[in-house]
Design a protein with these regions (language model features):
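Surface-exposed flexible segments
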Residues: 19-34, 66-75
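A short, charged, amphipathic alpha-helix used as a generic interaction element across diverse proteins
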Residues: 21-22, 29-54
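Short aromatic-glycine-(Arg/Gly/Cys) micro-motifs in beta-strand/loop hairpins
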Residues: 2-25
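Short, mixed-charge low-complexity intrinsically disordered segments
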Residues: 42-98
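Intrinsic structural disorder/low-complexity segments
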Residues: 15-16, 36, 72, 94
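Short, flexible beta-strand-to-coil junctions
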Residues: 12-19, 31-32, 54-62
Length: 98
């Protein structure tokens, strides 16, 4: 199967910090940067009980079926699915702190 490289945008909310362990909840995943920024701004304007939000751009190398699953079912995927990502580059784009 052919592999592709795509930029995927994640919005993650920091739920808990204990020492070097950070627990995050993924709030949004999309391949459209503009849409990700709009959702990030909307979520950042709301008051939450978290430590903050981060909008990150991941450059990922994978087969088309991997991207399909990631973009369509991101909220229901097991943690092991994310551990298999081949990340080419990571870049935080925006961050809020509580």
């Amino acid at each position: 199967m052919k592999e592709y490289i795509k930029n995927i945008y994640f919005i993650e909310e920091t739920q808990n910090i204990e020492g070097s362990y950070i627990e995050v909840k993924t709030r949004f995943v999309n391949e459209d940067k503009t849409k990700a920024l709009d959702i990030y701004k909307k979520l950042a304007s709301k008051k939450t009980n978290s430590f903050g939000l981060i909008l990150s751009e991941y450059k990922i190398k994978a087969e088309e079926s991997y991207f399909y699953q990631l973009l369509k079912r991101w909220s229901k995927l097991p943690a092991d699915f994310y551990r298999k990502m081949q990340i080419i580059n990571y870049q935080p784009l925006a961050e809020t702190h509580a």
